[in-house]
Amino acid sequence: MKKTFKLILVLMLSLTLVFGLTAPIQAASDTAVSNVVNYSTDVIYQIVTDRFVDGNTSNNPTGDLYDPTHTSLKKYFGGDWQGIINKINDGYLTGMGVTAIWISQPVENIYAVLPDSTFGGSTSYHGYWARDFKRTNPYFGSFTDFQNLINTAHAHNIKVIIDFAPNHTSPASETDPTYAENGRLYDNGTLLGGYTNDTNGYFHHYGGTDFSSYEDGIYRNLFDLADLNQQNSTIDSYLKSAIKVWLDMGIDGIRLDAVKHMPFGWQKNFMDSILSYRPVFTFGEWFLGTNEIDVNNTYFANESGMSLLDFRFSQKVRQVFRDNTDTMYGLDSMIQSTASDYNFINDMVTFIDNHDMDRFYNGGSTRPVEQALAFTLTSRGVPAIYYGTEQYMTGNGDPYNRAMMTSFNTSTTAYNVIKKLAPLRKSNPAIAYGTTQQRWINNDVYIYERKFGNNVALVAINRNLSTSYNITGLYTALPAGTYTDVLGGLLNGNSISVASDGSVTPFTLSAGEVAVWQYVSSSNSPLIGHVGPTMTKAGQTITIDGRGFGTTSGQVLFGSTAGTIVSWDDTEVKVKVPSVTPGKYNISLKTSSGATSNTYNNINILTGNQICVRFVVNNASTVYGENVYLTGNVAELGNWDTSKAIGPMFNQVVYQYPTWYYDVSVPAGTTIQFKFIKKNGNTITWEGGSNHTYTVPSSSTGTVIVNWQQ
């Protein structure tokens, strides 16, 4: 009897190691559709609503707005929310492993057709030419249709993210009020104003940006789009109330358009208003070109309270897998540098193409698409897949990259790569939360390991479509055993054998091959993988996700101060933020048995509700290399720490040198003290005289203007 039991045990252990799992893993609460502040366990599918499926022909536009032949690429094609509902219900999206959809901005857009000789007219099919942020685009559907989309998605464990573009309304001309709809803005049907004769100052009127500076891109128009003045109290309150309309509908996330082109301070206070009302995961669009690194981009990701689309990731993946203009060393360097630069790397939204870029597939072999998808789905961050990528759609540039969805074939290799790898984000926390370590590399081969506690995923990619490589000297954190390819050989992967010292038996990685091997284990010690939101206030609730927390409540420490536990289970803890000195905190967790977790760093606890105030200083003359910054006695102004001072301030568009200005998020209803400083490298020159004082308004926006004190 004992021998029989031992034999069964050995067989069970052998099967366990072959499949790479120690035990069946049940769905964890951190992966639930209700967890709207954590998308690390999700796969997003980006949909240009008008170009996906026409599910209700009765709401299609008429006349010159609409092209039923789907050839005039800047006209409406008829895609709508009912079409998305249909593809959820028929299993196309769920079958692919999609757990979140990002849809076009749902608000009412202009009805004008702009002249366009190439495409026979240009319309607002894309959703970015808003006229009323509190009404729906009728060509996408009604509020009832939108609610049906939300309900259907949630019933299928899919989160819904909306695009939202508070930077602008629609095309307008300063000199021709008849052009398009003159950028007019409506509040639930009531006209607020248009771009010409803008006596209330709802818009910026500084001309179009030439993208020459960060400041220029913020306060001047993007192309011919009427640029909203968020510092105007009416616009500020309007945009904050508008997003609440959609939050009340039950959306689960927000993608903010053109965050590079709006004031950082206003966006931070806008984000605070969202987090105070109904926190949801929010990420912004800040375009970066190939090999571009922008300190303002990094600062925004770390300090704004929202995440960003990871253009550094996207551009490098395209260089390596699509264009062959860089090697795997460049890919690995990007993974390392972004992990160093971005505080919340697992919140960065990764992608290989989108509606503003050439589609990834450009003909020829489809294997580069499949390799890039596999890399994105197994890398850190939140993967977003552009509609049609799984069908190998092509198209260089707008609008060719926004054609009508061509097929819903569930047999393509790309579809099945996604289908097999997407579920790993929920079943293996190494994929959702793990660190990344390069294990073997040459110009064409990248073998990397994701690890979270005892959970491991090892991924091997050979981008060379004609050359195989012998892999020797490979080590891994996978326990001893034989591991099958999670992809089941879909991209020619095979099994590997791991010895007790972590060495992998040498093997051949064939041309174009991709393989994924994994090990999933329950955790007996606490490990934090995600905290959200990353910007909060005393009394608000944040969510801590990870493994090994146990089922009995312990403690969550903000530095050394414990918060009040709201709920506690083995993978997710909700805790109220304690009343502590505002600033950045490292969070740790202590289980009921006394085990202490890792720390999760840089959670920003604000002084209070935020208001955007424009700080202006006159007569601040500088020498070459000097810039003016702002500091003060609250955490939002750096608490007099010059290394945390706000700036460099601007001096070209709204005001001109020697006047400097900056829009800053500061605590509402608070009397603050502040001063300006000049920085030139490590040299700091303080403003003279007494501290300036200012009482921040309790709501709306503010402006304070002072003279530089000698």
Curated annotation (Swiss-Prot):
* Reactions that this protein is recorded to catalyse: Cyclizes part of a (1->4)-alpha-D-glucan chain by formation of a (1->4)-alpha-D-glucosidic bond
Q: Where is the IPT/TIG domain?
A: 526-603
Q: Where is the active site?
A: 257, 285
Q: Which residues form the CBM20 domain?
A: 605-710
Q: Does the keyword Signal apply?
A: yes
Residue numbers binding Ca(2+) 2: 167, 218, 227, 261
Question: Secretion signal: which residues?
Answer: 1-27
Alphabetically, which GO biological process terms does the record hold? Answer: carbohydrate metabolic process
**Key words, A-Z:** Calcium, Glycosyltransferase, Metal-binding, Secreted, Signal, Transferase
Q: Does the keyword S-adenosyl-L-methionine apply?
A: no
**Compartments (UniProt record):** Secreted
The positions annotated for binding substrate are 128-129, 168, 221-224, 255, 260-261, 355, 398, 402
Q: What is its main location?
A: secreted
Q: Which InterPro entries match?
A: A-amylase/branching_C, A-amylase_C, Alpha_amylase, Carb-bd-like_fold, CBM20, Glyco_hydro_13_cat_dom, Glyco_hydro_b, Glycoside_hydrolase_SF
Q: Which GO terms describe its molecular function?
A: alpha-amylase activity; cyclomaltodextrin glucanotransferase activity; metal ion binding; starch binding
One cellular component term (GO) for this entry is: extracellular region
What EC number(s) does the entry state?
Answer: 2.4.1.19
Cofactor binding note of this UniProt entry: Binds 2 calcium ions per subunit.
Q: Which top-rank group of organisms is this from?
A: Bacteria
Q: Mind telling me which Pfam families this protein's record contains?
A: Alpha-amylase, Alpha-amylase_C, CBM_20, TIG
Q: Tell me which stretches of the chain form a coiled coil.
A: none
Q: Where does Ca(2+) 1 bind?
A: 54, 56, 59-60, 78, 80
Q: Where is this site: Transition state stabilizer?
A: 356
The UniProt family comment states:
Belongs to the glycosyl hydrolase 13 family.
Q: What's this protein's function?
A: Degrades starch to alpha-, beta-, and gamma-cyclodextrins, as well as linear sugars.
Protein name according to UniProt: Cyclomaltodextrin glucanotransferase
User: Source species, please?
Assistant: Thermoanaerobacterium thermosulfurigenes (Clostridium thermosulfurogenes)
Name of the coding gene: amyA
